[in-house]
Curated annotation (Swiss-Prot):
Residues under site feature: Cleavage: R96, T97, A117, T118, R205, S206, A280, S281
Keyword Glycoprotein: yes
Ranges of Basic residues composition bias in the record: 17-27
Protein name: Genome polyprotein
Species per Swiss-Prot/TrEMBL record: Langat virus (strain Yelantsev)
């Protein structure tokens, strides 16, 4: 046996030859020292023990060779001296004051003892040292041995803790790649919290989340971080200032006179201009506005409504209506995946084995909610192994998610989405953009809804039959909602399902407890002998928000999840609508005053409001003429049969041809120049008609019968060319239109040139079809 290597327990120590003289070579003789030197050295050791600092090499060598008897005598002498000083302080305090200083002093000493590293024994016989940041570079007495703590990442105790083995080495060995080692005692574990200490270095700080811009969704909703809302609002402010120069100048003068300082003046003017109320009644405050005009005898119109837009319906002998799609939402949609944006790591434990001792194991490896990693570390003589090589090491940490740091996905059900449509008649009352008209009615539709009839008071009834379409592919759409932590951030976004499912974040389904792919927010450090650090990647909210730039924004109001893009196609029945005030007498022309002078609405129309001091109710005489043709009324009234009622009225909206015009309301007159081009207006209305027909898609055609095909063709013609036809021949009567169509068809039949013949025939047919048609 003398020639063989001997391994010590639990991996063994360095191999050595059994020799009778070996103990004499390694053991140092404890010779007698001067008593004064021993006392001075013991005071130094005591000082370092009280302050928690590391001892110098001289004191370490002294502690190893000092005779036990001399050390005990020196400590007893120090104890007697401290006791004498304590008694003297107590006596002096009792003579001068009644305050007992002994009790606070003892409490302070005991508290200091409690705050130092504590040692406890587990049921399996192992010892556990619980240390804190102040215990770094200190020795701890454990039974008959001592343990040295060299860890630098210790903080105050909390859930973010770390536990690993304190290796046992011999007196002659030097520690290698360990933060804790013991001599004279085995099976010791070090545990400490890491709160309050500085974060360690990480190779990465975020996960990789691709931008969502490559997966565009259909629809024209507001997009986050695109700047469109700011641009749109600045455009509105600019338009209002340009149309209200006098009011703007007055506002600037008032601010300049009432406020001192250049910067406050500028701020007040800018804020006031951003909040100024513009002329607004029903659809006039919306930029996306469309006009649909029915010909004489029209009883049914097909409208295309989209979020953020409005359609004004006008027809001969019928009151004008504003119809718009107000909201698209679903109550409490189903929840799909839930992602964690900020991990909370607690209870880290490490187990390690020497080479050839098998794999390291931890019970936490088989528990849910933990993240583990296996690796190999360098082991050898300086860290309690008899062989040099790679040893197994495993680290596990408990994973949970921080509060208010989750991103949840919700999916829509097509059958449960509600579309809210609002209808409002033109009553001649001025209503500001932030006010609600008393005659406004609402109707809600789903996929299974039938026809709805709305009662508009004195204006009769209007029927709505709508086919809903979301404007986005709901099967591939997920509403990504964040916990609301910052008021300036949006609440939710409409994202593509594939992008949502591919997010590199921990996730779980609704109701589940364990997180899948929890290791995506955890990083493990380089393995040391018996320790492997664990790092938290931190909050990933900023990375997610960056990837959402350009994504359509959704909104959540209570349990209602709103879509920000979509459209519906509605058939509006006008047969039961009736005009109000047809039997009123005409108002006295001399008693009108301007309440709001004519101004451009931004939709190629003119809006105004007049006051009346005569007897009510009555009909307002209003017309407009072009320069040089005073006998022809060129005004197309959007507000039909404007009246002055007992409790309101006087708001008028009309459309004028481009050029110089004069507006007459009673004896009032106003010079007005209408910007634009007649040809451009025709082309624009034709373009809008084509857009409406495109949105209608397959719903615009009925191939079930010959009559259905002819009806579909007529409806398509009215949809595409109705606006242009009304612009060109809107002021021409019914009979002249019939005669014009017949004349053009007759000319086409008698033309010898085939091209001209076909042109006249098509033109005459269109005029007759648009005049005699009953739907648009």
């Amino acid at each position: 046996m003398a020639g063989k290597a001997v391994l010590k327990g639990k991996g063994g120590g360095p191999p050595r030859r059994a020799s009778k003289v070996a103990p004499k070579k390694t053991r140092q003789l404890r010779v007698q020292m001067p008593n004064g030197l021993v006392l001075m050295r013991m005071l130094g050791v005591l000082w370092h023990a009280l302050t928690g600092t590391a001892r110098s090499p001289v004191l370490k060598a002294f502690w190893k060779v000092v005779p036990l008897k001399q050390a005990t005598l020196a400590l007893r002498k120090i104890k007697r001296t401290v006791s004498t000083l304590m008694v003297g302080l107590h006596r002096r305090g009792s003579r001068r004051t009644t305050i007992d200083w002994m009790t606070p002093l003892l409490i302070t000493v005991m508290l200091g003892m409690c705050l130092t590293a504590t040692v406890r024994r587990e049921r399996d016989g192992s010892m556990v040292i619980r240390a804190e940041g102040r215990d770094a570079a200190t020795q701890v007495r454990v039974e008959n041995g001592t343990c040295v703590i060299l860890a630098t990442d210790m903080g105050s105790w909390c859930d973010d803790s770390l536990a690993y083995e304190c290796v046992t080495i011999d007196q002659g060995e030097e520690p290698v790649d360990v933060d804790c080692f013991c001599r004279g005692v085995e099976k010791v574990t070090l545990e400490y919290g890491r709160c309050g200490r500085r974060e360690g270095s990480r190779s990465r700080r975020s996960v990789l989340i691709p931008s969502h811009a490559q997966r565009d969704l259909t629809g024209r909703g507001h997009q986050w971080l695109e700047g469109e809302a700011v641009k749109a609002h600045l455009t509105r402010v600019e338009g209002w200032v340009w149309k209200n120069k006098l009011f703007t100048l007055s506002l600037v003068m008032v601010a300049w006179l009432m406020v001192d300082g250049l910067l406050p003046r500028i701020l007040i003017v800018v804020v006031a201009l951003a909040l100024v109320p513009a002329y607004a009644s029903r659809c006039t405050h919306l930029e996306n506005r469309d006009f649909v005009t029915g010909v004489q005898g029209t009883t049914r119109l097909t409208l295309v409504l989209e979020l953020g837009g409005c359609v004004t319906v006008t027809a001969d002998g019928k009151p004008s209506l504003d119809v718009w799609l107000d909201s698209i939402y679903q109550e409490s949609p189903a929840q799909t995946r839930e992602y964690c944006l900020h991990a909370k790591l607690t209870g880290t434990k490490v187990a390690a084995r020497c080479p050839t001792m098998g794999p390291a194991t931890l019970p936490e490896e088989h528990q849910s909610g933990t993240v583990c990693k296996r690796d190999q570390s360098d082991r050898g003589w300086g860290n309690h192994c008899g062989l040099f090589g790679k040893g197994s090491i495993v680290t596990c940490v408990k994973f949970t998610c921080e509060d208010k740091k989750k991103a949840t996905g919700h999916v829509y059900d097509v059958n449960k989405i509600t579309y809210t449509i609002k209808v409002e008649p033109h009553t001649g009352e001025f209503v500001a953009a932030n006010e609600t008209h008393s005659g406004r009615k609402s109707a809600s539709f789903t996929v299974s809804s039938e026809k709805t009839i709305l009662t508009l008071g004195d204006y009769g009834d209007v029927s709505l039959l709508c086919r809903v379409a979301s404007g986005v592919d709901l099967a591939q759409t997920v509403v990504l909602a964040l916990d609301k932590t910052h008021e300036h951030l949006p609440t939710a976004w409409q994202v593509h399902r594939d992008w949502f499912n591919d997010l590199a974040l921990p996730w779980k389904h609704d109701g589940a407890e364990a997180w899948n792919e929890a290791g995506r927010l955890v990083e493990f450090g380089t393995p040391h002998a018996v320790k492997m650090d664990v790092f938290n990647l931190g909050d990933q909210t900023g990375v997610l928000l960056k990837s959402l730039a350009g994504v359509p924004v959704a909104s959540i109001e209570g349990t209602k999840y709103h879509l920000k893009s979509g459209h519906v196609t509605c058939e509006v029945g006008l047969e039961k609508l009736k005009m109000k005030g047809l039997t009123y007498t005409v108002c006295d022309k001399t008693k009108f005053t301007w309440k709001r002078a004519p101004t451009d609405s931004g939709h190629d129309t003119v809006v105004m409001e007049v006051g009346f001091s005569g007897t009510r109710p009555c009909r307002i005489p209003v017309r407009a003429v072009a320069h040089g043709v005073p006998e022809v009324n060129v005004a197309m009234l959007i507000t039909p049969n404007p009246t002055m009622e007992n409790n309101g009225g006087g708001f008028i909206e009309m459309q004028l041809p481009p050029g110089d015009n004069i507006i007459y309301v009673g004896d009032l007159n106003h010079q007005w120049f209408q910007k634009g081009s007649s040809i451009g207006r025709v082309l624009q209305k034709t373009r809008k008609g084509i857009e409406r027909l495109t949105v209608l898609g397959e719903h615009a055609w009925d191939f079930g019968s010959v009559g259905g095909v002819m009806t579909s063709i007529g409806r398509a013609m009215h949809t595409v060319l109705g606006g242009a036809f009304n612009t060109l021949l809107g002021g021409v009567g019914f009979l002249p239109k019939i005669l014009l169509g017949v004349a053009m068809a007759w000319l086409g039949l008698n033309m010898r040139n085939p091209t001209l013949s076909m042109g006249f025939l098509l033109s005459g047919g269109l005029v007759l079809a648009m005049t005699l048609g009953v739907g648009a």
